[in-house]
Amino acid sequence: MTFTIAIDGPAAAGKGTLSRKIAETYGFHHLDTGLTYRATAKALLDAGLPLDNEAVAEKMALELDLAGLDRAVLSRHEIGEAASKIAVMTPVRRALVKAQKLFAMREPGTVLDGRDIGTVVCPDAPVKLYVTASADVRARRRYDEILANGGNGDYDAIFAEVKKRDERDMGRADSPLRPAEDAHLLDTSEMSIEAAFQAARTIIDAALKR
């Protein structure tokens, strides 16, 4: 029987790094569900198709191959902007959630991270984590990341973008971002990834022994 770990949280809270570390440690399959929305958006952009046509976007979502998700390519800013436009479409969410649910059934276990894993995709997951941090800390991390990659960052613009993204994710009518009632809260504002990982590991190990 498979063991699923559901990890949710806002942008730049550290859930992606934490999820990959957990999956590697336990030998589980990992899926960053945000990449499924980005890949769908990229397919539309590559085909020169509009981002406001739900039927076309749904068709692309249904044809998505989860094995072909390239984080480096899909991390581009313009793809993220396009993804945020299709992520609010109910038919697109429905198609991608179905694919994500199938992924979650892989043996021996899976780690899925996103915005609605513990509430919608895997509501019965034995471990649910909600990874968060203050908007200021998350904007600072994103700013530092851009500088580290040789880019030019505007902290105020990044902070405004983080706040706008939060409002969009939490105010969405379909599957808004919120912690599952039985999720363990990990606030990484003043916590290193290693400390967050050790806290998560304690929770996971306890669940595996049940």
UniProtKB/Swiss-Prot annotation:
Query: Where does the chain cross the membrane?
Result: none
Root EC class: transferase
Which molecular function GO terms apply here?
Answer: ATP binding; CMP kinase activity; dCMP kinase activity
Give the GO terms filed under biological process for this record: pyrimidine nucleotide metabolic process
Q: Where does ATP bind?
A: G9, P10, A11, A12, A13, G14, K15, G16, T17
Q: Does the keyword Electron transport apply?
A: no
All disulfide bonds of the chain are none
User: Can you state which reaction this protein catalyses?
Assistant: CMP + ATP = CDP + ADP; dCMP + ATP = dCDP + ADP
Q: Chief localization class?
A: cytoplasm
Where does the protein end up?
Cytoplasm
Q: What is its EC number?
A: 2.7.4.25
Keywords (A to Z) from UniProt: ATP-binding, Cytoplasm, Kinase, Nucleotide-binding, Transferase
Q: Which HAMAP family match?
A: Cytidyl_kinase_type1 (MF_00238)
Give the family from UniProt. Answer: Belongs to the cytidylate kinase family. Type 1 subfamily.
User: What is the protein's given name?
Assistant: Cytidylate kinase
Please give the organism. Agrobacterium fabrum (strain C58 / ATCC 33970)
